[in-house]
Structures are given as structure tokens and as C-alpha cells.
């Protein structure tokens, strides 16, 4: 196994661990999920460029009669990248004591203010940063609002 193959295996493993964490483990952490909201996807073009570059590497490897293992690993990397960017939905998970946004748990006590912009972006101000949350469906903003009203403490 070459160094290139080893690097590809490491990247594929890291991406798979991230996908498993995002899809399964995050749902089980910090208690029961009270509300799950799908967010708008970002960086579609970036992934398309990444997969295109991997396609070029696959083509070069095949034309240069490179190792078949490298080709399979590149195809695997492309498939994982497509899954993470196009099949999996980014989500906002509300728990009893806080919520997961961008794979980070944020406690409700850190929220200083919440606003809704004119174009349907939920703005949550924390102590030191501002979260701009774009939901997939605008109806989900009402679900979030109702969730906060019901669970206000």
C-alpha cells in the first residue's frame, strides 16, 4: 500500500466517522431529541468541484495504469463526499438543555437574543458570536418558535 493509498484510507475513515457521528451519535447525545429541523444545504458547488477533481484523479490513475486499489479508494472518497454533501441533510437538533447546530452543542442559557430577518433567516445571538440559521422550509421557523414558547424557563 502506497502513501497515497494510506492517506486516502485515512480521509475516507475520517469522513465516515463524521457521517456516523452526524447521523446517529448526535441524536443520542445530550438526551432525547425534542425537535429536528432540516437546514438549507450550503457549498453544493464546492462539493461538485471536489468530486470533479476526484474524477480527474480517477481518470489519470486509470490512463496511467495506476494501482487498482488507488482507483477504488478514489471512487470511495467520491461516494462519501457525495453522501455528505448531497444525500445527508444538515440539521438543527433541539434537546432539553440546548441544541446542536453545525455539530456543536449550544446551551439555551447562552442565547442572548433571537430575531427573524425579512428573508426568513433565524438570527441567534450568543455571548460572542451570531448564528445565522437558514431552514429548508419556512414552516419550520414556526415549529422552532412554538418549541421555544412551550419550553421557556
UniProtKB/Swiss-Prot annotation:
One Pfam family of this chain: DUF986
Transmembrane portions of the chain: 6-26, 45-65, 67-87
GO terms for cellular component: plasma membrane
Topology with respect to the bilayer: Multi-pass membrane protein
Chief location: membrane
Keywords assigned by UniProt, alphabetized: Cell inner membrane, Cell membrane, Membrane, Transmembrane, Transmembrane helix
Subcellular location: Cell inner membrane
InterPro entries documented for this protein: DUF986
Family under the similarity heading: Belongs to the UPF0266 family.
Name this protein carries in UniProt: UPF0266 membrane protein YPO1755/y2554/YP_1637
Organism: Yersinia pestis
Amino acid at each position: 500500500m502506497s502513501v497515497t493509498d494510506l492517506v486516502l484510507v485515512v480521509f475516507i475513515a475520517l469522513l465516515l466517522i463524521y457521517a456516523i457521528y452526524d447521523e446517529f451519535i448526535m441524536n443520542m447525545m445530550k438526551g432525547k431529541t425534542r425537535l429536528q429541523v432540516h437546514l438549507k444545504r450550503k457549498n453544493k458547488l464546492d462539493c461538485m468541484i471536489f468530486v470533479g477533481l476526484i474524477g480527474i484523479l480517477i481518470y489519470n490513475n486509470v490512463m496511467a495504469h495506476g494501482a487498482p486499489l488507488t482507483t477504488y479508494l478514489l471512487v470511495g472518497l467520491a461516494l462519501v463526499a457525495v453522501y455528505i454533501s448531497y444525500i445527508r441533510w444538515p440539521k438543527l437538533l433541539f434537546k432539553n438543555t440546548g441544541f446542536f447546530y453545525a455539530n456543536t452543542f449550544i446551551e439555551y442559557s447562552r442565547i442572548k437574543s433571537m430575531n427573524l430577518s425579512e428573508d426568513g433567516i433565524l438570527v441567534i445571538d450568543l455571548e460572542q458570536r451570531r448564528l445565522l440559521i437558514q431552514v429548508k422550509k419556512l414552516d419550520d421557523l414556526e415549529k422552532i418558535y412554538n418549541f421555544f414558547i412551550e419550553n421557556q424557563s
